[in-house]
Amino acid sequence: KIVHDIAYLGNKEQKFDIAMLMSHGGKKSFSDIHTLGALSDTAKKSFRGTLDFLRGAVASEGAEEDTCLLLDPTVKSISLPLLLCKEDNVVGNHAASAGQIDHNKLFYIMSRGFSEVEAKHIIVESMIRPIIDRIGDETIEEAALAAVRNKI
C-alpha cells in the first residue's frame, strides 16, 4: 500500500514539475496519489501521473487526483493523468481539476468580517490543511503550516 500526498503553493515565477509513476506488479497492491495546491502571479505547474497495472497485478487498485486552485488569470496548470493496464481484474481511477475560488464561498467568508485577502488565505489554507494534518509529527505539522501561512 502506497499513499502519496503532495501539496504545493506557487507564486511569482515559480515552476513545479510533478511526475509520479506507480507500477503495480503484485496481487492486491494499492496506490493513491493526491496532489493539490494553489498558484498565483505567473506560477506554473505540470503534473504527470501514471498508474501502470502490469500483468500479475490481479485485484489491485490505484487512484490519482490533481486539484489546482488558480488565484490569478496569468497562472498555468497542466495535468496529464495516465492509466496503463495489462491486467483484467483491476480498479484504476484518475481525475484532474483546476479552477478559481468559488465566489459564493469567498463572499460568505467576507460577510463574517474578513477582507478579501484574508478570505483567500483561509480558503487556500483549508485546502492544504488536510495533507499537513496527515504528516503525523506535530512539530513538522506546525512548521509546514507556518510555511504555508508565510507563503500565502
Model segments located where?
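Extended amphipathic alpha-helical segments enriched in small hydrophobics
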Residues: 106-114, 118-130
